[in-house]
Amino acid sequence: VTDDSSDPTPCSSCTPVDPICTDCTITVIPQLPLISITKDGTLDMGADGIANAGDVITYNFVVTNTGNVTLSNVVVNDPLLGLSAIAVTPGTLLPGAVGTASATYTITQDDIDAGQVDNLAVATGTDPNGDPITDDSSDPTPCPSCTPIDPTCTDCTIVEINQNPSIAIVKEATFNDNNGDGFPQAGETITYTFTVTNTGNMSLFDVIVTDPLPGIVLTGGPIDLAVGQSDSTTFTATYTITQADIVFGSVVNQATASAETIDGEVVDDLSDDDSELEDDPTIVILEGCKLTIFNAVSPNGDGSNDIFYIQGIECYPNNTVEVYNRWGIKVYEVNNY
C-alpha cells in the first residue's frame, strides 16, 4: 500500500517547480539578491609628472555578488565617463563571485582647476526572477584629506589632481632717442614692454603688473590667462629719464606680475630681462655724451677751426666754460655755452 505525501501546512502563495506536483511539500528558501561595487581611480600624469588637460585616469571596478542567488547580465554604468553597460568579466556571478571591469577618463582643465575628479558608478545585475539589482560604488582607497565637491556624495571616488599654479614675467626696455642725437638726456623716455605667461597648470585670473619705479606710467590689465598662454601686448609703460639717472649711468628695476587662481590663491613673479626662468632686473645703460675739447682756434674765416668747439656740450645745457691762458689766467668765461 502506498501513498504520496501531502503538506499539512501548504504554502498558499507558492507555485511548485513541477506544475503537476500539486501535493508537493514546498520549503521556501529566502532569496537575498545583493550586489556591491568598488571603484578606484589612478591618474597617469605622463613623463613630466605634472597634471595637464588630456592626462588620463584609469578606473578599475570590482563587482561582487554579495547575495545568495546567481546574478546575470552584470554591467557597470558610469555617468562621468559617458558610458553605460560597461562589460563585467564574468557577466554572470554566482554568490560570492567577483567580476571586474575598467574604463578611462580624460581630464579637462576644469578638473585641474577643481583639484579633483569625483563621481559614482552603478553596478547592475539581474536576479533569477528577472528583477534588476543595483548598488552605487564606494572607494576602496578613499582620500582621508579630501572633501567631495558635492557634500552629499560621501561615497564618491575622489581622484586628486596636483595643482601647480605659477606665472612668469619678462620686462624689456627700449630707449626712445626722442631728439635723435643718439645720446640719452633728461626728459627723453624709455618704453617698457611686459610679457606675462601662465607657466602653471591652472587657469589664472585678474593678472596685473606693478612696477615700483618712481615716475613710471604703466597701463593695461587686468587680464585672464589660460594654461600656457602668453600676453605681450596688454601691459606697457613709459618712463621719463631724469638727470639723476644720467649721472647714475643707468635705470635699473623690476616689475611684478600677480594673479589669482579660481580658489583665490595668489601667485606672483619678479620680472627678468629676457627669460621666464630667472629674476634678473631690467637695466638700461645711459651712455651720455662724451665731451671732446678742441683747443685749437683760428678765427680767420677759412672755415676750419673758426670757432671754439666742444663736442657733446649740448648734452649739458647748464654748463660753465672757462678758458685760461698759458699762465693760468682766466681769459674767458660763459654760462650755457
Write out the residue ranges for each language-model feature:
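Exported/extracytosolic protein signature
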Residues: 1-290
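Short loop/turn motifs at secondary-structure boundaries
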Residues: 286-337
